[in-house]
UniProtKB/Swiss-Prot annotation:
Keywords: ATP-binding, Cytoplasm, Kinase, Nucleotide biosynthesis, Nucleotide-binding, Transferase. Coiled coil: none annotated. It catalyses: AMP + ATP = 2 ADP. GO terms for molecular function: adenylate kinase activity; ATP binding. The keyword Kinase applies. Monomer. Residues 127-159 are annotated as: LID. It comes from the Bacteria. This is Adenylate kinase. ATP binds at residues 10-15, 128, 137-138, 195. It comes from Streptococcus pneumoniae serotype 2 (strain D39 / NCTC 7466).
Length: 212
């Protein structure tokens, strides 16, 4: 099986990806792992990527696309199939992936799209607070401290509602054209993500069992 998994930050994509890999024995290909492996193995694209990262610059699409192609060309993919996680991030990368798969003679069989209401994600992602003295982490809604006094806690910039909302808005704007592109090919399977982790996986399992 050759799959993509998509979903907004906080939708539980990482958790479900791990469950899919364990149950269906496909190769889990995450963007971070790909970059680290390519740089460690000093592949042509890995060396190029490192040169940008060392300068503190963004890695251009053609290098990212090249790293993906290197990984998808490896022998284990032919044997196990793959679950691609964190790529493509833009419609341009989606078109590049289509081209890569066509060149390698690989067929994409399904996109698992975990859907969670953005307002729920905003609450989930922006609720983290940290105790100023102990450094303990809590969540305003899901794991509130017993003795909550606002002045005793702080939030990291990344966790503040306005920062989280910006991140979600960017992800929505980038993700919608990708979903539309693959939906037109009949590949997208929407999964309700606002339920228990095991129920989410049960829904995914039904979809993937029918794909086999």
């Amino acid at each position: 099986m050759n799959l993509l998994i998509m979903g907004l930050p906080g939708a539980g994509k990482g958790t479900q990806a791990a469950k899919i890999v364990e149950q269906f024995h496909v190769a889990h290909i995450s963007t971070g792992d790909m970059f680290r492996a390519a740089m460690a193995n000093q592949t042509e694209m890995g060396v190029l990527a490192k040169s940008y990262i060392d300068k503190g610059e963004l890695v251009p699409d053609e290098v990212t696309n090249g790293i993906v192609k290197e990984r998808l060309s490896q022998d284990d993919i032919k044997e196990t199939g793959f679950l691609l996680d964190g790529y493509p991030r833009t419609i341009e990368q989606a078109h590049a992936l289509d081209k890569t798969l066509a060149e390698l003679g690989i067929e994409l069989e399904g996109i698992i799209n975990i859907e969670v209401n953005p307002d729920s994600l905003l609450e989930r992602l922006s609720g983290r607070i940290i105790h100023r003295v102990t450094g303990e982490t809590f969540h305003k809604v899901f794991n509130p401290p017993v003795d909550y006094k606002e002045e005793d806690y702080y939030q990291r910039e990344d966790d503040k509602p306005e920062t989280v909302k910006r991140r979600l808005d960017v992800n929505i704007a980038q993700g919608e054209p990708i979903i539309a592109h693959y939906r037109a090919k009949g590949l997208v399977h929407d999964i309700e993500g606002n339920q228990d982790i095991n129920d989410v996986f049960s829904d995914i399992e039904k979809v993937l069992t029918n794909l086999k």
